[in-house]
């Protein structure tokens, strides 16, 4: 994994996107964000991304799980760390889908520090003290 892996943050809440992007950069990650599934797919076509943080509940009919399903079909993302971050309650089927596609589930308001530590583990990085 790269020294400064780039993380794509998909969340429809501008405050969450901005906060996550800033904090990821503080912890030594590159960060880019998207508010919709279409924006995220465009980012993935144009930028090298090594990890993803996806919100489940997006405005409209698409979800972060839709991106999870499509991205795992692409060989370059087969082993990419994907964290699912949601404030809602998921069904057993949704949780099974997340597990089956090798993603990791975090419920808001899980501390961002916990999420970054887990991302550090998945990317093989040590977070600066």
Predicted regions and their residues:
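Short amphipathic alpha-helix used as the core "switch/output" element in two-component signaling
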Residues: 42, 65-78
């Amino acid at each position: 994994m790269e020294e400064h892996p780039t993380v794509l943050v998909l969340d429809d809440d501008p405050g969450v996107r901005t906060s996550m992007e800033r904090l990821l950069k503080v912890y030594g990650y590159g960060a880019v964000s998207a508010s919709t599934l279409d924006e995220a797919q465009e980012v993935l076509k144009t930028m090298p991304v090594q990890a993803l943080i996806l919100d489940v509940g997006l405005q409209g009919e698409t979800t972060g799980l839709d991106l999870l399903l499509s991205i795992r079909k692409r060989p370059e993302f087969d082993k990419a760390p994907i964290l699912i971050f949601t404030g809602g309650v998921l069904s057993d089927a949704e949780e099974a889908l997340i597990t089956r596609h090798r993603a990791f589930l975090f419920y808001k308001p899980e501390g961002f520090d916990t999420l970054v530590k887990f991302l550090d583990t998945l990317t093989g990085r040590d977070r600066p003290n």
